[in-house]
């Protein structure tokens, strides 16, 4: 598949999830997303209204993080926060699973949580992304989560919050994609800091990339394509 520079830009969820992010930081994030035509800004739930207003009239989404970054909230509170974020302008949701229940092998809980979160999103025509936080999981746990997701069908499964002990890994993206196939998309996030990282994740099967280095990556890809005298890059999927 051939990707133009704008195609690459539309894979990027431009991210600022820091606790000390200011209103000026949020405005900068949105301005950059508009300038480079990124797909989404990824922000903490409380910033949903401000960012959605900044992005009004554009095709750039406001993505709210729910139960972030630990996932340690009840299903009811996650659903409430999801609906609240959507009410305040969020039109994509990224939530963190309850890792404690996964470790306890309470797969019914994980499935119920995923289903209720998908329902809360889809009743408002909003995509739902499920964050696994792979750095804390075994390969078998990643596989089990992906199998549950294949059944429940959120819009995306996602590698990481970026706040754990490590971020996205190529082998994890490949594993997740091998299980869900084309039925559920895969988002890679965490530690993706340059164009080589970015391209490696896309080649591995990532359909979306969450990163705070979106501008740097965009500019590096632009330079690479200019130097190679091409207007697109071929990536085998």
Curated annotation (Swiss-Prot):
The keyword Cytoplasm applies. It is found in: Cytoplasm. It catalyses: 2-deoxy-D-ribose 5-phosphate = D-glyceraldehyde 3-phosphate + acetaldehyde. Pathway: Carbohydrate degradation; 2-deoxy-D-ribose 1-phosphate degradation; D-glyceraldehyde 3-phosphate and acetaldehyde from 2-deoxy-alpha-D-ribose 1-phosphate: step 2/2. It is an enzyme of class 4 (lyase). Keywords: Cytoplasm, Lyase, Schiff base. One of its GO terms (molecular function) is deoxyribose-phosphate aldolase activity. The active site is at residues 94, 158, 187. One of its GO terms (biological process) is 2-deoxyribose 1-phosphate catabolic process. Pfam families: DeoC. InterPro entries: Aldolase_TIM, DeoC, DeoC/FbaB/LacD_aldolase, DeoC_typeI. This is Deoxyribose-phosphate aldolase. It comes from Lactobacillus acidophilus (strain ATCC 700396 / NCK56 / N2 / NCFM). The lineage of its organism: Bacteria, Bacillati, Bacillota, Bacilli, Lactobacillales.
């Amino acid at each position: 598949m051939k990707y133009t520079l704008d195609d690459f830009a539309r894979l990027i969820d431009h991210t600022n999830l820091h606790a000390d992010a200011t209103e000026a930081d949020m405005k900068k994030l949105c301005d950059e997303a508009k300038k480079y035509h990124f797909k989404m800004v990824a922000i903490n739930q409380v910033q949903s209204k401000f960012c959605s207003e900044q992005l009004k009239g554009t095709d750039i989404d406001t993505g709210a993080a729910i139960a972030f970054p630990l996932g340690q909230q009840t299903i009811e509170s996650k659903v409430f926060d999801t609906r609240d974020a959507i009410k305040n302008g969020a039109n994509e949701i990224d939530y963190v699973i309850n890792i404690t229940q996964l470790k306890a092998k309470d797969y019914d809980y994980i499935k119920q949580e995923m289903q209720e979160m998908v329902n809360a999103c889809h009743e408002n025509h909003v995509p739902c992304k499920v964050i696994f936080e792979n750095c804390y999981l075994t390969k078998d746990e990643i596989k089990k989560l992906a199998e549950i997701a294949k059944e429940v069908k959120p819009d995306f499964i996602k590698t990481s919050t970026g706040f754990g002990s490590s971020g996205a890994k190529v082998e994890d993206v490949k594993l997740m994609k091998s299980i869900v196939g084309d039925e559920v998309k895969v988002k890679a996030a965490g530690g993706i800091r340059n164009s080589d990282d970015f391209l490696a994740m896309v080649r591995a099967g990532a359909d979306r990339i969450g990163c705070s280095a979106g501008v740097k990556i965009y500019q590096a890809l632009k330079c690479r394509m200019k130097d190679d005298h091409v207007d697109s890059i071929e990536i085998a999927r």
